């Protein structure tokens, strides 16, 4: 009998040991404050840090920007606050009684205590899958996820603790094994649409907590839309409700499809009179998304530490952006020591868990593991018609999980050239090119670690680099190490292509209900089917769902006199023809049927080759064809997160209130995702 999992309120979730806490192992950015600048101002002021580490302390602060300071009433003897004093008031915390077993406390200031966040979304599957030790109190019932006879109108203590923390109202901080523990934003760079974009970083995301489950799995919880950070540039660091809804639903939809992804724990908003987010079309409701992943480090986290040559001679002058201190050179510089520290962390137990021996070289293995994971991830994207929309190198995870849901879309009509991002005028990130763009990102990782790989191979003979590994090394030697690393990139590219093709084929064969692999399955079964979809502009997802009802026994023999068999086949063809999104003409339906007739006969023959395998695995004389259809339905869901549904959901959330609004997301998560098969 298994022992029940111990539950903890959010603010008391157990932290990992300090050896697995990212901020205790990666380098904190020294803000290099200009003389007289207040640290509370500094954490909100955008800066380019030429060579400054991996992360910067910043508390979540979901308030409007530009900041609006209250005007003092001179008649009452009030003194006008300056920006430093005003921001300091937000983070002058009142100590709260709390169990210190977790080593941290949830803290609130007088100003923060006036914030009134509302929890409008909570994912039970996220909790069950990755945070089974989290006690959310009555929050699931409050948001309508779990139905009870008495629907609570207020959150209980654990539920309120959750919303206070995941909305950014309260700040989790304290001491862990004698070391400070604070919220932070990560520093990274990236190539955007193929062009070096310089320092980017978490402009509207704050990592607030790391925790470890009873079975040893580490998770990081990050708030998106929680206010300005040192990487916000001229932006406000906030998120509108529609963007929060899109990521909340898509992350959980991807998880339901078994596509590697970050997870969405919760979605919060604030009353309009308290916070409105100003965008192109005027004020909009806000959102703060709590998302979860083992780490949110990405390929851009490495690029910032070893930027391409042109970046090392590029000055950054941007609206709202200051240099990294006393007005010094703001071009990015190589940080060899920071590169080593980050690489060791990512290769270790808290990252990829490569299982390296003491002193074993990690450069090649890290790159190959990141490449393999991302190749499998993008294969799943292709098989399920998911278009990310903006595969910049700063949006590609080192874990090979889908992150940063922006202008994404699941294709409706099957179109290899589908572009979901209206800003992608040249189609760089269209559906067909997604594997190539992932390879581009992996190549950027190879370039960032090229000198590490070269040094470990040429100089250290398979041993890992150590502290000071590039200190005093001349440029000629560095270039030679870089060439060795770049040559390894060719091997990585071959591996990515092979891994992608194998995973792509495996996942598609699952969707086609095939248990074995044959060399010609891709061209004969998969590609031929997709060509029919493209030729007739059929709905990608509906076509697979209908195909899940196909049985080889539907194919009539040429000499058969069984009219029911012929009727079943014609009825099935009719259903396939109805997968045209717009009401098809009889002529169009006839063309679709004619295209499918020969393909279905070939498909039926291929399926029948596996009848013995199916029959052997069955019990109680179950019909193998029906059992196969059941398996296909599990991987070809009837529910897909389509754009019209997102728009309809967002409208309901923007216009609704109270329990009715909270039930909107709960209904989709529960009815649509759970019952997807």
Each model region followed by its residue ranges:
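Conserved ATP-binding subdomain of kinase catalytic cores across diverse folds
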Residues: 105, 112-356, 399-401, 441, ...
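Regulatory N- and C-terminal appendages and interdomain linkers associated
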Residues: 1-186, 434-677
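ATP-dependent phospho-/nucleotidyl transfer catalytic cores
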Residues: 244, 274, 281-388, 401-524, ...
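Hydrophobic residue at the +6 position relative to the catalytic HRD Asp in the kinase catalytic loop
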Residues: 389-398
